[in-house]
């Protein structure tokens, strides 16, 4: 493994880990950064599956206590049964739309201009949602109804557009639908588990021929890096939301999106081949 390839794997692992669970779009950042450092082609598709799986395993580890409690109580406790049902209900819309439109979206929308526009629009919506007066009816994830779960699941489908952000769509959706900031964030993390594992399994099977033994060192660098930085990001976000709003992330999205559009408009960076991941 050449040092440059290892460096690319490290950088993309850091980007995936830091951005997957922040409301700033990991896919959008991956498209932009991968293009800037020249990491693309067939191997990149397999690599992305690996680092996304690492990120979700970091969340599973971080919430292992809650997961164990739910699994233990599922046969007999109504609260655990309702929580599990809500996750399945929220997961369902993404499954349906993902199977129907994933390839089409990847072909037509995976490019930096779409990412930039989605970042800006999402940032504006996030600012509006944060400044809007909230009527909270679900302080904790266990207070959610199946209707809350379904609405958040539908909001998650917006994240199929790169640059939107899966966590951003579900968290802001949760706030708009009456969840507290803590409940919306935690449910977003839990919903990420079946959603991302399902996506990884589907993509892994689809691109199974792209996994080659000679790429294992590259995958290992990306996996470890993504896992570590995802865990750090999740812990930091859970502490951050205790005393802060999501406005800082919204302004970052807007600034980053406008920067991408400016580099495209003034031909400072050639984005013509970007998104081929």
Swiss-Prot record:
> Does this entry carry the keyword Membrane?
yes
Instruction: Name the EC number(s).
Output: 3.6.1.27
Q: Provide the transmembrane region boundaries.
A: 47-67, 85-105, 108-128, 183-203, 218-238, 249-269
Checking InterPro entries in the record gives: UppP
Query: Which is a Gene Ontology cellular component entry for this protein?
Result: plasma membrane
Provide an example Pfam family for this protein.
BacA
- Which keywords has UniProt assigned to this entry? Antibiotic resistance, Cell inner membrane, Cell membrane, Cell shape, Cell wall biogenesis/degradation, Hydrolase, Membrane, Peptidoglycan synthesis, Transmembrane, Transmembrane helix
Localization in the cell = Cell inner membrane
Decide whether keyword Plastid is in the record.
Answer: no
Example of a GO MF term: undecaprenyl-diphosphatase activity
**How is this protein situated with respect to the membrane?**
Multi-pass membrane protein
Q: Which reaction does it catalyse?
A: di-trans,octa-cis-undecaprenyl diphosphate + H2O = di-trans,octa-cis-undecaprenyl phosphate + phosphate + H(+)
- According to the lineage, what is the superkingdom? Bacteria
Q: Which GO terms describe its biological process?
A: cell wall organization; peptidoglycan biosynthetic process; regulation of cell shape; response to antibiotic
Q: What class of enzyme is it?
A: hydrolase
Query: Main role?
Result: Catalyzes the dephosphorylation of undecaprenyl diphosphate (UPP). Confers resistance to bacitracin.
Entry's NCBIfam families?
A: PRK00281.1-2, PRK00281.1-4, undec_PP_bacA
What family does the entry list? Belongs to the UppP family.
Q: Which PANTHER family match?
A: UNDECAPRENYL-DIPHOSPHATASE
What more the UniProt record tells us is: Bacitracin is thought to be involved in the inhibition of peptidoglycan synthesis by sequestering undecaprenyl diphosphate, thereby reducing the pool of lipid carrier available.
Q: What is this protein called?
A: Undecaprenyl-diphosphatase
- The record lists the organism as Pseudomonas aeruginosa (strain LESB58)
């Amino acid at each position: 493994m050449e040092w440059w390839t290892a460096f690319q794997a490290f950088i993309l692992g850091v980007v995936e880990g830091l951005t997957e669970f922040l409301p700033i779009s990991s896919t959008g950042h991956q498209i932009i950064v991968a293009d800037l450092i020249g990491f693309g082609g067939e191997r990149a598709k397999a690599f992305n599956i690996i680092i996304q799986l690492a990120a979700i395993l970091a969340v599973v580890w971080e919430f292992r206590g809650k997961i164990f409690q739910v699994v233990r109580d599922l046969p007999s406790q109504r609260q655990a049964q309702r929580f599990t049902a809500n996750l399945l209900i929220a997961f369902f819309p993404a499954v349906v739309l993902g199977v129907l439109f994933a390839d089409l979206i990847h072909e037509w929308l995976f490019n930096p201009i779409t990412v930039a526009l989605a970042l800006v629009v999402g940032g504006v919506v996030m600012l509006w949602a944060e400044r809007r007066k909230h009527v909270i009816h679900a302080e904790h994830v266990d207070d959610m109804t199946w209707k809350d779960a379904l609405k958040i699941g539908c909001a998650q489908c917006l994240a199929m557009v790169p640059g939107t952000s899966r966590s951003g769509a579900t968290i802001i959706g949760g706030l708009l639908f009456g969840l507290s900031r803590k409940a919306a964030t935690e449910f977003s993390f839990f919903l990420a588990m079946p959603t991302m594992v399902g996506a990884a399994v589907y993509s892994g099977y689809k691109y199974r021929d792209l996994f080659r033994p000679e790429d294992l060192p590259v995958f290992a660098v990306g996996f470890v890096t993504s896992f570590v930085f995802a865990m750090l990001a999740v812990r930091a976000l859970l502490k951050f939301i205790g005393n802060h709003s999501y406005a800082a992330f919204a302004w970052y999205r807007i600034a980053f999106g406008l920067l991408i559009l400016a580099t495209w408009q003034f031909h400072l960076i050639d984005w013509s081949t970007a998104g081929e991941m």
